[in-house]
């Protein structure tokens, strides 16, 4: 959706809403929109730059507040009658809770279905929907199904980028046979330790079971200890339960901070040759690593029938207070303009379908965006969609236990018992 088209929509909204009564928690003369979000520091500065053209075009001030306690701060604000006009959710699960409580305005009251599909592929609209109704506008995507490697080391040793899981595991065994370590894995992440392991299992589930089965798993329509989940965990174990597969073995995997685990690709000699992690790990690359020393490929398919799905995360806007200004801002966020601005600033990938790849400032980001754009199947991080007691509780801790050597069946049974009844 081009900016001039959205500008026309914004003008139309001004005319339409000027005839209406006051919006929720607002009034006709209001010239400000408030946002509560998770981006702070440098990321907050970037989103404020992306929002600036809206203020320039409309004269409406956008007040963005970034907090690192979003999941607790937002419910308190809403319950006390001080909801922000818009919230930027780091995952759609919490958004869905507010939607089901009737706290959010459906996007269909602002944009037509045609305008939505012009801006986003159906997969992203499905992820923004709650019980069939779209509520959110996606702003940023994280591409998680990536394997990082040092192309100079591959070229020097005659290694080829694997196109299938079987080829990737054959390369891993080839490295072991030469006395080398295939993988670097670090899952330590403070209070969030374990999420690296959940990402692995989710990615494998998408490659060994249908998207519908994945959705059933997330919704607990199948139990957590279902045989298909156990199969995914077993495949993960082919890497984690083999001390020769990962640098430092189990102890190294459990104790290495996730941001440090990619560093092994660039030591001399390399500590490892493969590292699976999302696009955000680029922020942890050593400053002295040149562009020709790092590359990526999508985590390969396992079962041919399920193709090459991509596991994603992302940030999504939804509207609490139905004011003319908030409607205009939601329309702007669905246009290509804020995404184009953000793309040029780096450390960002847009889920919007109309973003020129040449806007991204570096080769790696363009490649990540291209992988996302080509994906026929995308699914959101499962742990972010599950109840907190599981997704950020027993699923995380279960991965720590499993990597440490616990029996996989027992781990899955423990997680299943923890699911809220």
Curated annotation (Swiss-Prot):
One of its GO terms (cellular component) is plasma membrane. It is a lipid-anchor. Keywords: Cell membrane, Lipoprotein, Membrane, Palmitate, Signal, Sugar transport, Transport. Induction: Expression is very low in cells grown in basal medium but increases significantly after a salt shock. Residues 1-18 form the signal peptide. Its main location: membrane. Disruption phenotype: Inactivation of the gene results in loss of the ability to take up glucosylglycerol and sucrose, as well as to accumulate exogenous trehalose. Insertion causes leakage of glucosylglycerol from the cells into the medium. It is found in: Cell membrane. InterPro entries: Bact_solute-bd_prot1 (IPR050490), SBP (IPR006059). Part of the ABC transporter complex GgtABCD involved in the uptake of the osmoprotective compounds glucosylglycerol (GG), sucrose and trehalose. Binds glucosylglycerol and exhibits a somewhat lower affinity towards sucrose and a substantially lower affinity towards trehalose. Belongs to the bacterial solute-binding protein 1 family. This is Osmoprotective compounds-binding protein GgtB.
């Amino acid at each position: 959706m081009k900016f001039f088209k959205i500008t026309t929509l914004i003008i139309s909204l001004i005319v339409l809403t000027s005839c209406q009564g006051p919006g929720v928690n607002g009034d006709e003369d209001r010239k400000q929109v408030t946002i509560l979000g998770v981006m702070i520091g440098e990321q907050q500065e970037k989103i404020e730059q992306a929002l600036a053209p809206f203020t320039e075009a409309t004269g409406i001030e956008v007040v963005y507040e970034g907090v690192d306690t979003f999941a607790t701060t937002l419910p308190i604000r809403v319950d006390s009658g001080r909801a922000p006009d818009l919230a930027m959710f780091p995952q759609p699960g919490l958004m869905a809770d507010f939607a089901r409580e009737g706290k959010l305005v459906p996007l269909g009251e602002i944009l037509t279905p045609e305008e939505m599909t012009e801006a986003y592929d159906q997969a992203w609209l499905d992820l923004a929907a709650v019980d069939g109704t779209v509520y959110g506008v996606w702003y940023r995507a994280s591409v998680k199904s990536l394997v990082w490697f040092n192309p100079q080391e591959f070229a020097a040793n005659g290694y080829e980028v694997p196109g299938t899981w079987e080829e990737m595991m054959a390369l891993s065994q080839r490295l072991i046979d030469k006395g080398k370590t295939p993988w670097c894995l670090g899952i330590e992440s403070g209070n969030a330790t374990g999420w690296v392991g959940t990402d692995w299992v989710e990615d494998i589930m998408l490659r060994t079971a249908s998207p519908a089965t994945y959705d059933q798993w997330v919704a607990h329509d199948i139990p957590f200890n279902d045989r298909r989940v156990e199969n995914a965990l077993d495949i993960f174990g082919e890497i984690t339960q083999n001390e020769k597969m990962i640098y430092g073995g189990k102890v190294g995997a459990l104790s290495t901070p996730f941001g440090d685990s990619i560093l092994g690709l660039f030591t001399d000699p390399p500590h490892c040759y493969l590292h699976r992690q999302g696009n955000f790990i680029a922020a942890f690359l050593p400053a002295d690593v040149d562009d020709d020393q790092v590359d990526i490929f999508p985590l390969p398919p396992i079962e041919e029938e399920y193709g090459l799905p991509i596991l994603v995360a992302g940030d999504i806007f939804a509207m609490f207070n139905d004011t003319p200004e908030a409607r205009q801002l939601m329309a702007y966020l669905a246009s290509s303009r804020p995404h184009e601005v953000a793309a040029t600033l780096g450390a960002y990938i847009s889920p919007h379908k109309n973003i020129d790849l040449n806007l991204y400032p570096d080769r790696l980001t363009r490649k990540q965006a291209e992988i996302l754009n080509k994906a026929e199947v995308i699914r959101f991080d499962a742990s972010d969609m599950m109840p907190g007691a599981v997704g950020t509780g027993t699923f995380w801790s279960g991965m720590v236990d499993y990597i440490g050597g616990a029996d996989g069946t027992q781990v899955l049974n423990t997680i299943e018992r923890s699911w809220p009844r």
